[in-house]
Amino acid sequence: MISFSSFYKKIADSSLQHWLETLPAILGQWQREHKHGTLPKWEKVLNKLHYPNPDTLELKDSVTIGSGQQLTSGEQQKLENLLRIFQPWRKGPFSVHGINIDTEWRSDWKWERILPHLSPLNNRTVLDVGCGSGYHMWRMLGEGANHVVGIDPSTLFLCQFEAIKRLAGEEQPIHLLPLGIEELPPLDAFDTVFSMGVLYHRRSPIDHLLQLRDQLRTGGELVLETLVIDGDENTVLVPEDRYGKMNNVWFLPSAAALALWLKKADFVDIRCVDIDVTSLAEQRSTDWMPNESLVDYLDPSNIDLTVEGYPAPKRATFIATKNQPNKDLI
């Protein structure tokens, strides 16, 4: 069974230590609930990932584990076969011992867009909410973060993350917990909190912003990326049914409306640092994710629209600061 003991040890003498009052019971329940099903099968695959520590580990400009010279071609093929069991791979790319995991998303492009606007991550304790398989977590570590914690309830994402971590070296200060943010107590401890590609999946977006705020220390930085539409501060799209074939998209605000939401949630220094239309080159089907992708979600006669007739995906990134506690919002 995947163990979280190294995480408990890591936070025992940190600003997160009070989390130990509740977290082991929550994760213990998760482990009991996943004794059967696909997780045990995936854990058998993880247990086969016995490879030497990589001769190189590049996290600053990419996520590259090993130079490709340590393994024979046969060993590389065996490793690739094991990693392919965890398909579909959505967020990346990763390079592992010469194997290029060409994921659905070019998540490195998003990182390059937002990185210049971040407060330095050096020595920071960072939370990535809805982290997927953890690609951006590794890039955060590459920027010098002291400890990176990701949360995502997906068992597949957890196993993909564990595979990469075992190949990179399990001593790395980076951990993924199979939790949703609603399972976190108000920790008031993280220097930086990321929420990228999550807000539009929340039935109550203001509550999500308040949950993010509750994880930050006072003066900590929120990095929020979500789908937006054009319009003024009163413009919000509520899809009637599906959006881009997704049935779990609830609210798409304009950038101006989202700024108001952040202000309502008692953030300050609110600024929109990037707005980008998702391109067919950034999100596409690959050999590692052979299912439908963005091109299948757009109107074939007009890629500025989804198949339902809504504006095509456009993503805005906001950065904001947690204000001093406001008793009216507690």
From Swiss-Prot:
Regions annotated as coiled coil: none
Assembly, per entry: Homotetramer.
Assigned protein family: Belongs to the class I-like SAM-binding methyltransferase superfamily. CmoB family.
Name of the protein in question: tRNA U34 carboxymethyltransferase
Residues noted as binding carboxy-S-adenosyl-L-methionine in the record, renumbered to the chain: 91, 105, 110, 130, 152-154, 181-182, 196, 200, 315
Role: Catalyzes carboxymethyl transfer from carboxy-S-adenosyl-L-methionine (Cx-SAM) to 5-hydroxyuridine (ho5U) to form 5-carboxymethoxyuridine (cmo5U) at position 34 in tRNAs.
EC number: 2.5.1.-
Organism: Shewanella woodyi (strain ATCC 51908 / MS32)
Keyword tRNA processing: yes
Pfam annotation, one family: Methyltransf_9
Keyword Ligase: no
Reaction equations catalysed: carboxy-S-adenosyl-L-methionine + 5-hydroxyuridine(34) in tRNA = 5-carboxymethoxyuridine(34) in tRNA + S-adenosyl-L-homocysteine + H(+)
Molecular function, one GO term: methyltransferase activity
Keyword terms of this UniProt record: Transferase, tRNA processing
InterPro entries linked to this entry: CmoB (IPR010017), Mo5U34_MeTrfas-like (IPR027555), SAM-dependent_MTases_sf (IPR029063)
Gene Ontology process terms (BP): tRNA wobble uridine modification
